[in-house]
UniProtKB/Swiss-Prot annotation:
It is found in: Cytoplasm. HAMAP family: Thymidy_synth_bact. The gene is thyA. This is Thymidylate synthase. The active site is at C146 (nucleophile). PANTHER family: THYMIDYLATE SYNTHASE (PTHR11548:SF9), THYMIDYLATE SYNTHASE 1 (PTHR11548). Belongs to the thymidylate synthase family. Bacterial-type ThyA subfamily. Catalyzes the reductive methylation of 2'-deoxyuridine-5'-monophosphate (dUMP) to 2'-deoxythymidine-5'-monophosphate (dTMP) while utilizing 5,10-methylenetetrahydrofolate (mTHF) as the methyl donor and reductant in the reaction, yielding dihydrofolate (DHF) as a by-product. This enzymatic reaction provides an intracellular de novo source of dTMP, an essential precursor for DNA biosynthesis. DUMP binds at R21, R126, R127, R166, S167, A168, D169, N177, H207, L208, Y209. The keyword Cytoplasm applies. It is an enzyme of class 2 (transferase).
Length: 264
């Protein structure tokens, strides 16, 4: 995954030193894009080991519309622990907005079901968009959405997805984001009888925290290995029927993990 390493290299070379909400400080660039052909392998970073179990369970948690970390804790996933309140609640974050967006007339919109219906019925539509950025709910969220909006595109029997991410923790978060939205694209493509196309990742503020710079440089010393393959249970045709056991990752041969502190 040279695209990811190129992003880190770009930020180390051209990044602006900035303060941030967490008080850690960052090297930051504004506006950057990566593209991944999902036909050539599953874009999971190989220059450090990624916790695939967390990636899959987090995505399933979003798709369930849940915003309490109980499901994650029961499945050994701790990536949201730092933000949850004493009851495990996170407020109306991703899962709520994806599945239960509250409209001004009092109706509730399931954006995931809606966008899948659009892909099936009007694949040339330019409105196949899911948004997590609900301005009226931001103050109720424990963490405002970083991956804000994604759009689907169908051409030549292939489904592509573009994500706009307003804020990107390059070292810790971005490998998860790439894999998560690529996996979501594979799942929706299967449910819509399409082949996977591209995952396009567009950033607003892409940054390396100042206490991640040495880890980033270590990762840049490692030569990327061949991408793994992600196999989905081909019998699943409803996006909400997928379970953890329906995913099998083949030929993942990463370098050892690199630890880094989370900026909260």
């Amino acid at each position: 995954m040279y695209q990811y390493l190129d992003l880190m290299r770009h930020v180390l070379q051209y990044g602006h030193k900035k303060s941030d909400r967490t008080g850690t400080g960052t090297l930051s660039v504004f506006g950057y894009q990566m593209r991944f052909d999902l036909q050539t392998g599953f874009p999971l970073v190989t220059t450090k080991k990624c916790h695939v179990k967390s990636i899959i369970h987090e995505l399933l948690w979003f798709l369930r519309g849940e915003t309490n970390i109980d499901y994650l804790k029961r499945n050994g996933v701790s990536i949201w622990d730092e933000w949850a309140d004493e009851n495990g609640d996170l407020g109306p974050i991703y899962g709520h907005q994806w599945r239960s967006w509250a409209a001004s007339d009092g109706t509730v919109i399931d954006q995931i079901s809606q966008v899948i219906q659009q892909i099936k019925e009007t694949p040339d539509s330019r409105r196949m968009i899911v948004s997590a950025w609900n301005v009226g709910d931001l103050d109720k969220m424990k963490l405002a959405p970083c991956h804000v909006l994604f759009q689907f595109y169908v051409a030549d029997g292939r489904l592509s997805c573009q994500l706009y991410q307003r804020s990107a923790d390059i070292f810790l978060g971005v490998p998860f984001n790439i894999a998560s939205y690529s996996l979501l694209t594979l799942m929706i493509a299967q449910c819509c009888d399409l082949q996977p196309g591209e995952f396009v990742h567009t950033f607003g503020d892409a940054h390396l925290y100042l206490n991640h710079l040495e880890q980033a440089r270590l990762q840049l010393e490692r030569e990327p290995r061949a991408l793994p393959a992600m196999q989905l249970n081909s019998t699943v045709r409803n996006i909400f029927d997928f379970g953890y056991e329906d995913f099998t990752l083949h030929d993942y041969d990463p370098y050892p993990p690199i630890k880094a502190p989370v900026a909260v």
